[in-house]
Amino acid sequence: MPLPTDPSPSLSAYAHPERLVTGDWLYFHLGKPGLAIVESDENVLLYDVGHIPGAVKVDWHTDLNDPKVRDYITGEQFADLMNRKGIARDDTVVIYGDKSNWWAAYALWVFTLFGHPDVRLLNGGRDLWLAERRDTSLAVPNKTSTSYPVVNRNDAPIRAFKDDVLAILGTQPLIDVRSLDEYTGKCTEMPDSPEESVLRAGHIPTARSIPWEMTVDKSGRFRSSEELERLYDFITPNDKTIVYCRIGERSSHTWFVLTHLLGKPGVRNYDGSWTEWGNTVRVPITAGESPGAVPV
């Protein structure tokens, strides 16, 4: 049975406040039946130096991605993962992580591909929990389940592929959430990830640059609904927006903002993102600060 929605006034103005929890709410519900806490970080070593009591670790790279094909795990693999982590289908899952929930949002997006009914983010993530001097633990929960059902992944509503992006150029909003240096073509990789360099730099023509970090404040919490609405005021109710970054992790964060905080319908995450686009033969690319025009 899902746990109650966080009643905090700080969340009430969002379109779907039931998709967020505050540190106060999570602290109050620690150890309660029906709650599963997941930590998912870019730095996969952080969990081992202290985590929220009762949290299990989900490694975005080894747990959520297929080990052979560049794709996500299957329904059978997801059910096995949930059972190994002791998560039931009717659990309320709260996910948090480092970097203002980059990878936590990515994990939540993958959980959504499998239709997990109640999955939420901890507003502010790991860093805010620590900044507020809340409890941490080194203990790894020893719990398993055998009841999580096999659910086929449903990509279509929230996932976009390269051909989907090509089909909407110039007709639907396309948002690049990477840094401005990546967008303009000044660099071909993130500064701390030289191994992920691509062959071509720049951005997809017509894409607007709205870096993901514009959606959070200094504490890592999401900005107010009013601030977010101003940031995305060009999106209309009938638009079918696609967001992208480098491999889909930062754009999962923006997908969460648009879908759950602002209630924009039909938003999809192009997880192939620049790693695919910047290495693909004969796809259009533009550089500079202008979105660029639809290729003729």
From Swiss-Prot:
Pfam families: Rhodanese (PF00581). Substrate binds at R250. The active site is at C245. It comes from Mycobacterium leprae (strain TN). One of its GO terms (molecular function) is thiosulfate-cyanide sulfurtransferase activity. Its EC number is 2.8.1.1. SMART domains: RHOD. It is an enzyme of class 2 (transferase). Keywords: Repeat, Transferase. Gene3D superfamilies: Rhodanese-like domain (3.40.250.10). Coiled coil: none annotated. Contains two rhodanese domains with different primary structures but with near identical secondary structure conformations suggesting a common evolutionary origin. Only the C-terminal rhodanese domain contains the catalytic cysteine residue. This is Putative thiosulfate sulfurtransferase SseA. The keyword Secreted does not apply. Residues 31-138, 168-286 form the Rhodanese domain. It comes from the Bacteria. It catalyses: thiosulfate + hydrogen cyanide = thiocyanate + sulfite + 2 H(+). The lineage of its organism: Bacteria, Bacillati, Actinomycetota, Actinomycetes, Mycobacteriales. InterPro entries: Rhodanese-like_dom, Rhodanese-like_dom_sf, Thiosulfate_sulfurtransferase, Thiosulphate_STrfase_CS.
